[in-house]
Design a protein with these regions (language model features):
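Sec-dependent bacterial lipoprotein signal peptides
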Residues: 1-27
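Feature for extracytoplasmic/surface-facing segments of secreted or surface-associated proteins
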Residues: 27-230
């Protein structure tokens, strides 16, 4: 019997242990999987979110609240409606931006760019209707409802809702939207793209004077979502 492989087993195990120790140290003792992803002992992860809050105009100096299945954080937007926040969280998260009479919502199923606009509000209207509920109940109860969490944490489900918003608004209001991926596309207020689409929707009557979706647009997306239940 050849016993020579034993010479290599111990060094290999030693190297593996050192690598594992170094990885844990890089995550401050938490478990790490993949590249730059650290999971804390309570199964949360450090999530960095950014985005722009706008209605066609920037929601400047607005309150931003990120509420996740586990974990929350707050910040303020800058003069251009931009926000950045880091939260130890279990996904998904709801983003709420409040400024005066305007309170808009969005969601995040990963780290990265997730904007908050009247379009994202309507996306949640559609998603809530698919789940047989309304936006207030979806936002208020998702932390304790695995079915809501599953839908909100699914990129495919969220992107399908986003596409439904674009299709419904274009057909109803006779506009051409140039940024169909409005949830995750970085944009600057006053520039072509997501913001110019918001301006066009406001002119067409889909967004009211307070920067909120018009009731007719809410009804439109409620009916569309209910017609495609999850």
């Amino acid at each position: 019997m050849n016993l020579h492989p034993r010479r290599f087993i111990r060094p290999a195990l030693g190297t593996l242990c050192l690598a594992t120790l170094a990885t844990l140290q890089a995550c401050n003792g938490d478990a790490c999987f993949g590249v730059d992803v650290c999971f804390n002992n309570n199964n949360t992860q450090t999530v960095a979110l950014s985005g722009t809050a706008a209605t066609g105009d920037a929601l400047a100096s607005a309150q931003v609240t990120v509420s996740c299945v586990t974990g929350s954080a707050t910040t303020l937007t800058d003069g251009g409606g931009n926000y950045r926040v880091t939260v130890n969280a279990a996904l998904p998260c709801v983003v709420t931006v409040t400024s005066g009479g305007t309170s808009l919502h969005s969601l995040a199923y990963a780290g990265g760019t997730f904007n908050t606009t009247p379009e994202t509000e309507l996306m949640l209207v559609y998603l809530a209707a698919q789940l047989g509920t309304n936006t207030a109940a979806l936002i208020g109860n998702f932390q304790g409802n695995p079915r809501y969490q599953q839908a909100m944490n699914s990129p495919n489900t969220v992107q399908a809702a986003q596409s439904a918003v674009v299709t419904s608004l274009q057909q109803r209001y006779s506009v051409t939207l140039t940024a169909p991926a409005f949830l995750t596309t970085s944009f600057t207020v006053g520039q072509p793209g997501v913001d110019s689409d918001l301006v066009a929707l406001a002119k067409a009557g889909a967004i009211d004077a307070n920067g909120m979706p018009d009731p007719a647009a809410v009804t439109l997306l409620t009916q569309a979502g209910a017609a495609h239940p999850l």
